[in-house]
Amino acid sequence: MKAIVQDAYGSTDVLEFRDIDKPDMADDEVLVRVHAAGVDRGVWHVMAGLPYPIRLAGYGLRAPKNGVPGTDLAGVVEVVGKDVTRFQPGDEVFGVGTGSFAEYARAGDDKLALKPANLTFAQAAAVAISGSTALQALRDRGQVEPGQKVLIIGASGGVGTYAVQLAKVFGADVTAVCSTSKMDMVRSVGADHVIDYTRDDFVDRQQRWDVILDIGGNASLSRLRRALTPKGTLVIIGGETDGRWLGGSDRQIRALMLYPFVGQKLGTFVSSQNHQDLIVLKELIEAGKVIPAIDRTYPLNESPQGIQYVAEGTPEERSPSPSERESPIRVTISTDHTQQSRQK
């Protein structure tokens, strides 16, 4: 099969497009013929092996344990393991697997769900990780209730666009923080109020929020707390700095240390993808309450360009306002390697 392969950590220069064997699968796994794979900043971090704790988390100390990058996927079940009962060959599925930047990938049956009927494979490939992260952050960590005021920093990115829509599903009044060019898009997915971080500072407003979701930003913990109600909840998801050891996790560490001594709930979490939450997302998507936002699609052999695009963002996103730096909306990779040009 055709696949993107890396034998060492590094930049996109370490990625090669070549033929390899199809992956072996366990009894509780399925083999998926991948039609599209999703790209987010996590793909870049795993490719680069940065920050270093990623390597300690099981990805391989000196070189990647799994030579094919990618987890988000959408495709068709090719083969099922003997213990799999949820799926059968021919089912169209989405979720997460191992090595999705390839024509075939293996996936646990508890990490997949049937693809929403109203989505293309490219759209469905951008749901599992970003959608699950937003869902769990708001429902489980933020415990958002109807009528609460929710601030979403990084609202125009992959997780952010889902967070805006899901917060509205939960009945919240949503304020989104994004750049000038993304304001209309963020409004279109349901934001009640939009703050242009290039012109306005959310902390300087009189408004205080019950729940703040900071997605990949670098606003200081003290500034975030000033924008939070006295009993409010702050959920920090990621953070983008150049640190090789902590990356953007220093704020999360400080939040966890401070939390026992203040009235506000401060913290972070690590999302996980599971069949039950994928079903929740599937039902919301099919009901028209949540829609994936796709920026562009690259053919499989241009995966390095897609990863680089996500890592760098647009020129506006590289502007000197790192405290509210946006992640680009999800990029998907088409496994049809015969595709000659990317769609924009």
Model segments located where?
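Glycine-rich beta-strand-centered segment in the early N-terminal region that forms part
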Residues: 21-38, 52-99
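Mid-domain Rossmann-like dinucleotide-binding core that forms the NAD(H)/NADP(H) cofactor-binding site
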Residues: 125-196
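Glycine-rich phosphate-binding loop and adjacent beta-alpha segment
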Residues: 215, 219-290, 323-335
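Short glycine-centered segments of the SAM/dcSAM-binding site in methyltransferase folds
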Residues: 92, 149, 232-233
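Short glycine/proline-centered loop/turn elements that form peptide/ligand docking sites
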Residues: 81-83, 174-185, 202, 218-222, ...
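A structural motif shared across PLP-dependent enzymes of the aminotransferase-like
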Residues: 97-109
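Short helix-loop-beta connector
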Residues: 88, 117-120, 143-149
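A short acidic, Gly/Pro-enriched loop at the edge of an enzyme's catalytic core
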Residues: 203-211
